Amino acid sequence: MSDNSVGIIGLTRQYPEFRYSTKEMIDVLGNKLTEKVKENILQLGVENRYFVRPLEHYVNKSSKQIKSVPDGEPISDLCKNVGEKCLSDLGLTKNDVTCIVAAFEDNDFLSPGLSSILLTKMGLSKFIPHYNIQGMACSTLPKLLELGKNLIRNKNDKVLFVISGCNSGWYLP
């Protein structure tokens, strides 16, 4: 749009069920982390982290890493719920969405990307443009907003952004 009147009209958030303080996570991981890694984690300033499954699901007492269960991480379910709530809060319908952009660190599967999964789970048209930006949610936000601004061509365009900052156990020692 030429008049630069592009803006964010609503925000909705939802957290996964399992919340852990950074200290709790360090305690659970015990001697699997070096002192330098522990110090780095504490200096990040993140007080709480949220997981889609209990932390114990990913870490056990042996040195064997526990993999995700066959149904994958239910991250797309959380994203679907928050996307639908956002539309409802704004008084929009699924037919109002002209594009979806999903940003995520972790996804249910390696492929397809989260936006493709959300099209199906939310019942959106499979013919609307949809994009994935993979990376840490904090670093993908600026790119997501830049892309979104460039996708809006007229006042009727409604781009749904879904940003997942869900932690999964894939990176735990």
Question: For each predicted feature, which ranges?
Answer:
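Acyl-thioester C-C bond-transforming condensing/cleaving domain
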Residues: 2-3, 88-94, 108-173
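Cofactor-binding loop segments of dinucleotide-utilizing enzymes, especially the Rossmann-like FAD-
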Residues: 11-13, 105, 164
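Generic, well-ordered alpha-helical segments
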Residues: 67-79, 106, 110, 136, ...
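Conserved active-site "lid/cap" helical segment
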Residues: 2-98
